[in-house]
Amino acid sequence: SLPALESNTRQLLERQELLPPETYPGPHAVVQFPLSDGDTYQMLLSQPARQGADGIWCVERWLQGNGNLYYVYPETEVSAREYYADLQAQCDEGHQPWLLEPLEVAAEYIRQDLAQNSVGLEQLTLLENASLDDFYNLPNN
């Protein structure tokens, strides 16, 4: 499939150091979460438009317990840069303030994109100021 091909290409280019190891530079957060299969998964969250307390968060990539990696890009007609700049502007105007909270962003992604409605905020574990090593260090499943 095209998404799998794109993901494999990105992984290859990152390993060869032809692309930076993260999509968005700056601070990251790692969120661990259980899914219905019993495994613990994790996601890497980034601040794509502005870094700091007033910057929105997005899910950059997530990792299954078996090591399968999935990159996340907004499904939109505009570039990711434009998309996140618009979301940041909306948030600056007081709309969608939950985008400022990495746990809320993670929970929304789990519900909407992974269709796991039974996972609540209390089941999520947040590691702030995380590194890529933190993200790739899989929990024991």
Predicted regions and their residues:
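Short beta-strand segments that buttress and anchor functional surface loops
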Residues: A29-S36, Y136-N140
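Mature extracytoplasmic domains of secretory-pathway proteins
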Residues: S1-P27, Y83-F135
